[in-house]
UniProtKB/Swiss-Prot annotation:
A cellular-component GO term for this protein: plasma membrane
Region described as Disordered: spans on this chain: 213-235
Membrane topology, Cytoplasmic segments: 206-235
Database matches in Gene3D superfamilies: 1.20.1250.10
Name this protein carries in UniProt: Fms-related tyrosine kinase 3 ligand
Record note on quaternary structure: Homodimer (isoform 2).
Superkingdom: Eukaryota
Species annotation: Homo sapiens (Human)
Keywords: Cell membrane, Cytokine, Disulfide bond, Glycoprotein, Membrane, Secreted, Signal, Transmembrane, Transmembrane helix
Protein's job: Stimulates the proliferation of early hematopoietic cells by activating FLT3. Synergizes well with a number of other colony stimulating factors and interleukins. Required for the development of B cells, and dendritic cells (DCs).
InterPro entries reported for this sequence: 4_helix_cytokine-like_core, Flt3_lig
Length: 235
């Protein structure tokens, strides 16, 4: 008896490949119908923080974009990667505490986040700060986790580089700027009152001389002596 295999068309193979690829990679629709954040996440984080050495070195991103919707989710993505890394070097007791915290932020793996960009810079800090920031992000995200769609947050973004930022102060446009009058020298300001006083004194002296030479109404002007009169006076 011969059993015939079903005939598979190229379209069928293509559909199967699409289904497999979508199942292997995270969904592009980053939204949550039910809150993945438990009500006692702060207790789990505090228990881990109390057990860990407070000065255990980790790294946090220093130039993540301050995006209102995506910023908190991006920091949880990086924190979740640290939880996975710490579990590989922790003892059995520590692994249990790390796994409890990791469970609280593991929901970020349900979204197909892109690898961190090369522009992202990291600075060293201690584990207590990382856990504190994780708790703060969960507190801020919990009321909105089921109300927002985070599909546009799948690519972590860096802050603009300092070389591309505008200067901290820039002058107004020329058409909106009134021309500035040149500042007079200080010496000119000091000499100006003296010059005005001298000018006033000269004017008063000139006025007094003019007044003496001008006869008043009814006043007789003495005749100007002739040369003969001057000779008689001399003899």
């Amino acid at each position: 008896m011969t059993v015939l295999a079903p005939a598979w068309s190229p379209t069928t193979y293509l559909l199967l490949l699409l289904l497999l690829s979508s199942g292997l990679s995270g969904t592009q629709d980053c939204s949550f119908q039910h809150s993945p954040i438990s009500s006692d996440f702060a207790v789990k984080i505090r228990e881990l923080s109390d057990y860990l050495l407070q000065d255990y070195p980790v790294t946090v991103a220093s130039n993540l974009q301050d995006e209102e919707l995506c910023g908190g989710l991006w920091r949880l993505v990086l924190a979740q990667r640290w939880m996975e890394r710490l579990k590989t070097v922790a003892g059995s007791k520590m692994q249990g505490l790390l796994e409890r915290v990791n469970t609280e932020i593991h929901f970020v793996t349900k979204c197909a986040f892109q690898p961190p960009p090369s522009c992202l810079r990291f600075v060293q800090t201690n584990i207590s700060r990382l856990l504190q920031e994780t708790s703060e992000q969960l507190v801020a995200l919990k009321p909105w986790i089921t109300r927002q769609n985070f599909s546009r947050c799948l690519e972590l973004q860096c802050q603009p580089d300092s070389s591309t930022l505008p200067p901290p102060w820039s002058p107004r446009p020329l058409e909106a700027t009134a021309p500035t009058a040149p500042q007079p020298p200080l010496l000119l300001l000091l000499l100006l009152p003296v010059g005005l006083l001298l000018l006033a004194a000269a004017w008063c002296l000139h006025w007094q001389r003019t007044r003496r030479r001008t006869p008043r109404p009814g006043e007789q002007v003495p005749p100007v002596p002739s040369p003969q009169d001057l000779l008689l006076v001399e003899h």
